[in-house]
UniProtKB/Swiss-Prot annotation:
Signal peptide range in chain numbering: none
Cysteines engaged in disulfide bonds, as pairs: none
Transmembrane segments: none
Domain of life: Eukaryota
Pfam families, per database record: DFRP_C
Organism for this UniProt entry: Oryza sativa subsp. japonica
Bias (Polar residues) ranges: 312-321
Any one cellular-component term (Gene Ontology): cytosol
Protein name: Zinc finger CCCH domain-containing protein 11
Molecular-function GO term, any one: zinc ion binding
Length: 366
C-alpha cells in the first residue's frame, strides 16, 4: 500500500490562500457575476484539502443514530413516570424509573438512585418478630377505631390471642419462601396464629447442618491420640522423669529470682522483705539498744527540772527537795530495771568519779 499523504501544514495553506487572492485580485463583478463566482469557488476548492470520505460517513452515521435515539426517547418518555416519594422516605432508596430504561439525563444530580441493587441493600425481614405487633392505636384513624370497637366482641371470640406459630409461616420459612411480599394462606393479616419464630428456635435445615457438623467432630480422646501419633520423638512419661523435670524447673526459677535480686541489690532497689530474706542478721537489735535509749530519755527529763531550779534560786529549796526525792525514786526504779552487768558498770563509774557536796553557806564563808 502506498504511504498516506501527510496533512498540509498551516504555512502551505496560507501560501495557497495567498495565490488564490492574487488570482482573484482585480476581477470585476466578483460578487455579482455567476461565472466569476464559479471561478473563485473552483480556486478555493483547489486550495482547500479534500475531506476524508470515511470520516464523513462515520460522522453522518453518528448523527443519524442520535436523531433516532432522540425520537425513541420522545416516544417512551410519555410512558415512564417517577414514583411518588412517601413522607419520611429517602429518595435515594428508590431506583430512578428513567434510569431503568436508560432515559435519565440528570446524572448525579438526580434525586433518585441510579443503583439497581439499592432495593437488595435494604433492611432484611426479621423472621423472629411479627409485623402485625407494630400496629397500635396510634396508627389508626377515627374510622378504623370505630370499626375495631364495633367488631371487637365477635372478633375476640373468633381470633383469640395465642402463642401457637402458624404452620403456613413455618412451611414458608423452611422452604425459604417467606419475604416482604409473602401472604399467609390462612387469611393474610387476619390469621390469629403467630407469624414469628419463638426465641432460640432452630429450623430443620439449620438442625441438619448442626447435626452434620457434630457428626464430623472428633472426640477429644481421639484427637489427643492423633496428635500424639504425629509427634516423632516420643519419651515415655514416668514418675522419675516428671520429678526431674519439676526439679529443673524449680532450679531455673530460683536462678532467675537470684539474678533478679542481685540486679536489684546492685541498683539499691531492694525492698525490706528482700533485704531480710538476703541477710536476716542485719535486722537483729543490740541487747542494750532499748535500755540505752530509755536511760538517755530519763536523763534528759531530769536535766530540764534541774536547770529550772538553778534559775529560780534558793527560795525554792523545799520544792527542790521534793524534786530530788522524786528523782531518787525514779533512779531507784531505773536501777530496778537494770541488769547485773549494767549495775557493775555503774558502780565502777561512780568509784572513779569524786563527788563533792557543797553547802550553800560554805562558799560565802570562805
Amino acid at each position: 500500500m502506498p504511504p498516506k499523504k501527510a496533512a498540509p501544514s498551516k504555512a502551505d495553506l496560507a501560501k495557497k490562500q495567498k495565490v488564490v487572492e492574487d488570482k482573484t485580485f482585480g476581477l470585476k463583478n466578483k460578487n455579482k457575476s455567476k461565472n466569476v463566482q464559479k471561478y473563485v469557488q473552483s480556486l478555493h476548492q483547489a486550495v482547500q484539502p479534500k475531506p476524508d470520505p470515511t470520516k464523513t460517513a462515520a460522522k453522518k452515521k453518528k448523527e443519524e443514530e442520535k436523531a433516532r435515539e432522540k425520537e425513541l426517547n420522545d416516544l417512551f418518555k410519555v410512558a415512564v413516570s417517577q414514583p411518588k416519594v412517601p413522607v419520611g422516605v429517602d429518595p435515594k432508596s428508590i431506583v430512578c424509573e428513567f434510569f431503568k430504561v436508560g432515559q435519565c439525563q440528570k446524572g448525579f444530580k438526580c434525586k433518585f438512585s441510579h443503583d439497581l441493587n439499592v432495593q437488595r441493600k435494604g433492611e432484611k425481614i426479621d423472621i423472629y418478630t411479627d409485623k402485625r405487633d407494630a400496629e397500635t392505636m396510634e396508627d389508626w384513624d377515627q374510622e378504623t377505631l370505630e370499626k375495631v370497637v364495633a367488631s371487637k366482641g365477635a372478633e375476640y371470640q373468633q381470633n383469640k390471642p395465642t402463642d401457637i406459630v402458624c404452620k403456613y409461616f413455618l412451611d414458608a420459612v423452611e422452604k425459604k419462601q417467606y419475604g416482604w411480599f409473602w401472604v399467609c394462606p390462612n387469611g393474610g393479616k387476619d390469621c390469629h396464629y403467630r407469624h414469628a419464630l419463638p426465641p432460640g428456635y432452630v429450623l430443620k435445615s439449620q438442625m441438619k447442618a448442626l447435626l452434620e457438623e457434630e457428626s464430623e467432630k472428633i472426640a477429644i480422646e481421639d484427637e489427643i491420640e492423633d496428635q500424639r501419633k504425629k509427634v516423632k520423638t516420643t519419651t515415655p512419661m514416668t514418675t522419675d522423669l516428671f520429678m526431674e523435670w519439676k526439679r529443673k524447673k524449680a532450679e531455673e526459677r530460683e536462678a532467675g529470682l537470684a539474678a533478679l535480686r542481685a540486679e536489684r541489690a546492685k541498683n539499691d532497689r531492694m525492698s525490706g522483705r528482700e533485704l531480710f530474706m538476703a541477710d536476716s542478721s542485719v535486722f537483729v537489735d543490740d541487747a542494750e539498744a532499748y535500755d540505752v535509749y530509755e536511760r538517755q530519755e530519763e536523763s534528759e527529763a531530769n536535766e530540764e527540772p534541774s536547770n529550772k531550779n538553778q534559775d529560780e534560786g534558793p527560795s525554792s529549796s523545799t520544792s527542790n527537795g521534793k524534786e530530788v526525792e522524786e528523782s531518787d525514786d525514779e533512779d531507784i526504779n531505773i536501777d530496778d530495771d537494770l541488769d547485773i552487768d549494767e549495775l557493775n558498770e555503774l558502780e565502777a563509774s561512780l568509784s572513779r568519779t569524786s563527788i563533792q557536796i557543797r553547802e550553800p553557806g560554805e562558799g560565802t564563808s570562805s
